[in-house]
Amino acid sequence: MMPHIFLFLEIFSQEGGIQSYIKDVLQAYLTLPDCEAAEVFLLRDAPDCPNPFKNQGITFHYLKNNSATLGRIQLALKFLVSLLRKRPQRVFCGHINLAPLTRLYCQALDIPYTVLTYGNEVWEPLPNSQKQALQAAASIWTISRYTRDLMCEANAIDAKKVAILPCVVDEEKFNLGEKSLTLIKKYDTENAKVLLTVARLWSGDIHKGVDVTIRALPTILETYPEVKYLVIGRGDDRPRLEALTKQLGVDKQVIFAGFVPTEELADHYRLADAYVMPSREGFGIVYLEAMACGIPVISGDEDGSAEPLQDGLVGWRVPYRDAEKVAQACLEILPGQDQRCHPQWLRQQTLTKFGKKTLRAKLEQLI
């Protein structure tokens, strides 16, 4: 008998908070006893994707296909064959879209399964097949109290079966340091106060608050005329946001940097005087990354960011669509006098609660 099977939509072919979180979970899993026999099925990843876990004992099945339908058929067949041959102790379903298939097979074979959930994919009432798959699961893992509460209320889930497995930050990759002279020159920020957001600019999810922060700039500029707003990320919403900067007359202050590789993110965080993302998040790994680099943060006040910000202990929480409140929080941060602006304190508070050792301990407890 093998210990576990995992199913995910994709991990390596897309960048984003969910993908980053799953990689952290797998990395922690690899440090646990008997993990080497596990199998991972990836619906949308191809064999040539950059996989840092290759040759570490886990077997990966890449099922990306030019036809989405054929890819799902291949997943269904290969997953069933693996269940019949190896009879795992437990299946971990990494996305609600895969939960109905997981339920169908696991209930028939009397194999317990766990569903991993993250954010807005489970905040609203789900189709019956997905709702029933959650209700029938042996357990559900999610990343925040906020997602747990919304999911349970919307889908009649017993909260007792839901465990919190929070996001964590890579303290070695995201650390304190000096501002990069290369980036200062690249973005022309030598004498500027810098606000930063890292987010996908997707028109289907305008809740990252980039437009709200842009609307806050005229007020901030009255006190800090040299302020710059650096937006890292790519997506189809960029033209709308660029048009908004011109409409408000702040296009000279906003820098759309596009995609930045993960290995270069820490230097970009350290360039900032404040990380600003007044959004609706299931959690928000980017807040942890910024704070681990010693950068103060602003989040929304109606979402899962309450956890990385420790209910306001280590950051500013504002109404996520209120540009004036965002401006006010920025004006409180930029002088750098508040306790929540002290880099060493901010990093220590963050790592104590959201370091990788915490994730491993929690994962071992749950498994």
Which role does the model predict for each range below?
Residues C93-A99:
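Short His-centered aromatic/hydrophobic patch
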Residues L195, Q253, R270-G282, I295:
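Acidic donor-binding loop of glycosyltransferase active sites
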Residues F259-V260, D267-A272:
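Short alpha-helical donor nucleotide-sugar binding micro-motif in glycosyltransferases
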